[in-house]
Amino acid sequence: MLNLVCTSSDSSIKWPTAGWEVTTATSQGMNYDSLYAFSTQLESGDLGYIDGMLVIRNGMIVFEKEYTNDYDSLFKTTGTKLGKYNYYDPLWHPYYNNTRLHTMQSVSKSFTAAAVGIAINNGSIPSLDAKIMDYFGEYESSTPDPRRDAMTIRDVLTMTTGIQWDEFSMPYTDPTSNCVQMEESLDWIQYVIDQPMAFEPGEKYEYNSGATMLLSYLINKTTGQDLADYVKTNLFESLGITDYYWKHTPTGLTDAEGGLYLKSRDLAKFGYLYLHNGKWGNNQVLPENWVENTEAKPVDTIWPKFKYGFQWWLMPYGKNHTALLASGLGGQRMIVLPELDIVAVFTGWNIYEKPALDSWMAMNKMIDAVIDE
């Protein structure tokens, strides 16, 4: 279980709304040499194309490094364009339009889950156990099935929808991927609900980016706001996040499953919010029990070490501890270690046949660098 950092009236907690304070690793009980050695390994290319490493401890930056990769030249010799926002276009990946906004890919899903929690707390969504298809009256599935009608918001958050879906057995550049086909379609929601059901909802985990798009539509339908606008008003403004970009689908919905672009420092704010149980300063941004519920009833995944919560991966470590992992294609990783007061962010673009940064390695490097425990 997560042992969340206490946030009750502790005036010593630093809230980086206006920006992160920078300090030394040693002053915050971490070994700088260990962090530097890991950074050097990342920069060498041994673990693929890494764009940045950022480590927060006790609410301060203790290590930060960005690495240079010549994606313009690389894209000229690899792949073909695929989709409107293809993976081989340097104007879209890994940075947005020559800015420092980095693609988050499926890390976007964790933000979407937070929006659902806020909407439930605000009364826009009745509960986690509400039937999600009740909000899709404008759509009619070409594969009607009572199992789809029984699907709850909780089932969608935990990727146990029961929908027949495959996006993990092939590269994301493969046109037979359900995710790619969805992104190539004119109406992503219609594509998702047209897929046949394979299981009872809640029965089996199956990673499904289309499920997260259902949540985007749900937010729009229940709050009257596009997801991007809802997140801006109810999340980003509290955290002081002003510089971002979010892609939209052909029908105008926010691309909730992979369309967010952020700077690493702003992504770390989101992790810091979860580290502090959804509280930011004197403001309870997320429902008080939302972070706890994120991992309270984890589902098993196809990887024995990983479990899945509300659009977050859960990684056990130490004696009965759990790290939160927000993960996205290409090497986007944010690891939250509440017991150690650490948030670590890694960005990259490892979509090629190269070794890649492993989440367990990244987590263990952070744990091993702690010298005050």
Per-region residue spans from a language model:
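N-terminal leader/targeting segments and the immediately adjacent pre-domain N-terminus
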Residues: 1-96, 122-125, 186, 190, ...
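Active-site SXXK
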Residues: 59, 82, 89, 100-128, ...
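Short clusters of small/polar residues that mark proteolytic maturation junctions
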Residues: 66-67, 130, 338, 348
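Active-site helix/loop module of the DD-peptidase/beta-lactamase fold
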Residues: 92-93, 98, 122-163, 194-196, ...
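Active-site-proximal alpha-helical segments within enzyme catalytic domains
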Residues: 211-218, 258-279, 332-348
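Active-site Gly/Thr loop motif
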Residues: 241-244, 291-345
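Structured C-terminal helix/loop/strand segments within mature extracytoplasmic catalytic/sensor domains
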Residues: 326-373
